[in-house]
């Protein structure tokens, strides 16, 4: 009985509590949105305050930096500030010991050990490779400015160029393991499959690196061996060029059981002047070459690196006349007869053992060096050096997916295939780093556009030529001299694009500067009747170049059918 009574009381209490809990829960639900809203507003307010604080700190730091730069300008002058800025690589307006090191080495004549090294430690007992550098200075008379005796050019501007007559390190010794950077990645082990040793970080969209620099940044990783090699020529090599395409690319030319023959192409440049003179940039068209190396990088059979000298001009030069990036700049091009590094023989063990495991002297009783006999390499799969170099060229320059033939051959092919000639005439090579500014823009934009490539491949034979080469060809007495004269009559600095008949007649042409001007218009400035955005092509430069090519085809019809 008493138990039933307790149960009824408990049930009554539970029934009374249920409405109260429901009521409390309902009130909490009403309060919860309001509470969440307040918490959200507080978080938003705190976030905005934090952003404002960070923005204020940035403004303060920027103002402080401007104040320091203005004070430095008053103290040092423009040229002094330029020298200071060239050393201040992190732009904090303070020179650290590491940043001061180039000046210290210059004043004391003592080069300290570099902090940077390969990512992997080298085997001190590994094989060593002896190499020699060969260098013949640029022929000053090949520069355009030489025609008027370098009128208006200060002696100090060219001092670094004039004084560079020999390599700074004629001979050097490397560990074979240092050349491991040239080995292919695991997914590029086939003949003719290119890979990037040092990737390019620039494009037409990212712009270019500053001109007003004196000293190169410390190399990292795979850049180290290339930096050390090029430092044999000059103490200030820049492994990352100012203009695209940067970097180094390679592919396997041949494979055997134990060796690769690897062809490579390197884009690098040098800054020749020393403070207080302003920078002078020396940009060879390219470094190319090959290395025969064991698959484990323990042995190097052969190594050669060189600047091709088969063209009449192969080096671009640019120098500043002021301390800022906007200062006046002179540009010229010239011919470099020789710039190469070659191994003096295969790599050899640093320690020599006899058949009993005893260490031997490196020279015999007569004092002559012990000669090593190396087995012949039987290549199982291979291509020619030229074929491999072509693969690398297309990797660096996608516009070369269309073949560009030598000037005479282009007209012979056009006659045989009944096509027109698409010709680009300029004063720096279109397919290397000696190219001029507007030529660079063309090859990195419109000439590599897929619609343009398709039309060129279908209806034209393409060629590009140096002005200097056609001037020399013009002086000959063969039929191509007339073709050269017809080209030069239409040429305007710096680049002229032409459409020609197989007999050399120029039926249509456009200057690169004019082309770039009209294709840089804003969309609302473009006359709709001037351009037709058909076939799904919306890029103005591509549309304009296709229009130029089609106009050439149209203008050639009366001549082709006559």
From Swiss-Prot:
Function (record text): Plays an important role in cell protection against oxidative stress and in the regulation of redox-related calcium homeostasis. Regulates the calcium level of the ER by protecting the calcium pump ATP2A2 against the oxidoreductase ERO1A-mediated oxidative damage. Acts as a modulator of ryanodine receptor (RyR) activity. Plays an important role in muscle development and differentiation during early development.
Region feature (Disordered): 1-30
Keywords: Endoplasmic reticulum, Glycoprotein, Membrane, Oxidoreductase, Selenocysteine, Transmembrane, Transmembrane helix
Localization annotation: Endoplasmic reticulum membrane
Lineage start: Eukaryota, Metazoa, Chordata, Craniata, Vertebrata
Keyword Chaperone: no
Glycosylated sites: 163, 310, 457, 503
Spans traversing the lipid bilayer: 40-60
GO molecular function: oxidoreductase activity
Recorded superkingdom: Eukaryota
Main location: endoplasmic reticulum
Annotated protein name in UniProt: Selenoprotein N
Biased composition (Basic residues): 1-10
The species this protein was found in: Xenopus tropicalis
Annotated Gene Ontology cellular component terms: endoplasmic reticulum membrane
